[in-house]
Amino acid sequence: PKGFGYPTQITIMTFSVDKESDLQVLALNAASAALFVSNIDINTSVSAVRAAKIDGELVLNPTLSELNRSTLDLYLSGTKDDLLMIEMRSMGGERVDSSLVLDPLMDPTFSAPIITTHVSNAIGEDELIAIFEKTEQLLFESNAKYEEAFKAFKKETMEIEYKAHLLNEEMVKYVRENHFADIKSAMNQMAKSERSTALRSIRKKIILEQEDWNEAELKDAIENVKKEQVRAQILNERVRADGRALNEIRPISISTNVLPRAHSSCLFTRGQTQALVVLTMGGPKDAQMFENLTDNGTQNENFMVHYNFPGFSVGEASPIMGTKRRELGHGNLAKRALEPIVNLDGQTVRIVSEILESNGSSSMATVCGGYMALRAADIETSDVIAGIAMGMVSEGNKYAILSDIMGLEDHDGDMDFKVTGSKEGITAMQMDIKLGGISLNVLKEALYQAKEGRAHIIDIMVEAEKNIEFNDGVLPSTDFFHIDPSFIGEIIGQAGKTIREIIEKFEVAIDI
C-alpha cells in the first residue's frame, strides 16, 4: 500500500523439483499468495502466465520439456485488471529449406542431404498482439480465481501507521511561479551530473531568497516542479526536453574494430550513451559450465553477453565492486536479443559491453554494439538486430509514446519498454509499467513505433557494416575435420605429451 514503509521479506524456497514445472511462474504466484493472505492491507493478487509456440500452435503454461521445443518464450504478469510486466524472447532454430529430389531409378538406399538454414524465429507485431490477447485473458481469469480461493484464508488487516510523504505546497507554488524558467533551462542539460549541478544551483539560489526554508523539503518541491515541466512539455507541446519529436532517435555513430588486439569490437554511440562492446571467440572447452535445479546434469553455455556499468559513466565516484542485479539483467536481455540469430556450431563467444557514458538506453546500445561486434568478427548472423527503449507519459486519457528514451524520461515517465529485433520481427522484449497497468491498444501503438525506430537504427548499422575491416592478425579460425579413430592414441601421445606439444608449438586449441 502507498505509504507502507516497513521492511518486508518474502522467502521462496524450493523443496522438491519434478523437472517439468515452471519455477519462475510458481515462485511469483506463491509470493503473491503469501502477501494476499497476510495481515498487510493488500486486496489484489498478482500472478504470472507463460506462453510457448510449438509447431505453430500456442501453448499456455507449457512444461519445461515443451518450452525446450518452442520458438517463443513469453512471460506475463499482472492483476485481474491490468498487465504489469512482460518478458519475451524468440528461440532460434534450423529451418529445412530443401532436400534433393530422388529419381525413382536411383539407389533406394541413397540418403539425400537435407539443406537447412538457421533462423531467429523473430515474431511479428500482429502475431504477438494476438498472443497477448489470449494470455492476458488467462492472466485476468487466474487472478480472479486466486482471490476467490484465498479470500477465506486472509488474515484480519493490522492497524499500522502509514508514512505520508507530503509536499510543501507553499514551496511548490513559489518554485513554480519564480523559477520555472530556470528549471526548464536546467532540463536542457542532458547529462545526469550536469542536470543535478544545475538543480543544486537553483536550490542554493532559493535558499538565499528564503533563508528559513528547509533544504530537504525544497529539494522535493524542485523535483516535483521539474517532473511537472518535463511531462507537461511532452503531453502539451509534443516536444521533449532535448528538443526531439516524440518518435525521433538520437544521433548515432558506429566505429568497428577500434581495439587492434581484440578479436572484434564496436564503439556504439547514441546521443550521450556510449558502449564499447568487445567480442572474444573460443573453442568448445571455453564454454561456461552451469547447473539448474531443473536440469539433469551440467550444461555448457557457449554464448555469453556481459554488461558492465561503472560509476564514471554517469559522473559518479562509486567503487567498482561485484556484478549488480541491474548489470546481470541487462546482460541477460542483450543475450536473449542476439542469441537467436547466431549458430555457433562448436564455437564459444563472449561479448562484454563496457558502458563508457550513459544517458538512457545503455542496454539497447549493448544489443546494437553486440550485433556489430559479431559482424566485425566475421560471424554469420541470420538477421540484423537492433534495440530501442520506449517510454510513455500519461495523464488521464492523454498519453504520449516516446522512442529512444533518455535517462530523464525514464525517471519521470511511466513506462520502460525495451524492444529488440529485426525489421521483420521481435527477438526479445522487456516491459515494466509504473502506472499500475497498460491497455493492449497502447501496447500495440508502442510496438509499431518501436518497429519504425528499429528500422531507422538498422539502416545506419547496415551502412556501418560496409566499412568493417577485420582484425585478421588476431582473429581465430576454426577447422573441423575427421581422423581415423585408430590414430587418436598417437595424436594424444603418452599422458597427453604429443597433443600438448602441438598446442604449445602452433598456439592452437584442439578438441577431439
PLM segments and residue spans:
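Structured alpha-helical segments in the cores of large, soluble enzyme domains
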Residues: 1-3, 72-77, 301-307, 330-344, ...
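Glycine-rich, flexible beta-strand/loop modules in the N-terminal catalytic cores of phosphate-handling
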Residues: 1-8, 14-16, 20-21, 80, ...
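Secondary-structure transition/capping motifs at alpha-helix termini
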Residues: 2-4, 37-43, 284-286, 298, ...
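Flexible, glycine/charged-enriched surface loops at secondary-structure junctions
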Residues: 2-8, 43-45, 142-160, 193-194, ...
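Conserved phosphate/anionic-ligand binding catalytic regions in large, soluble enzymes, centered on
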Residues: 21-39, 256-279, 359-379, 489-499
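Mobile "lid/hinge" segments at catalytic clefts and subdomain interfaces of large enzymes
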Residues: 41-187, 374-468
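Extended amphipathic alpha-helical scaffolds
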Residues: 45, 154-298, 476-490, 498
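Polar interaction faces of repeat-based domains
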Residues: 505-512
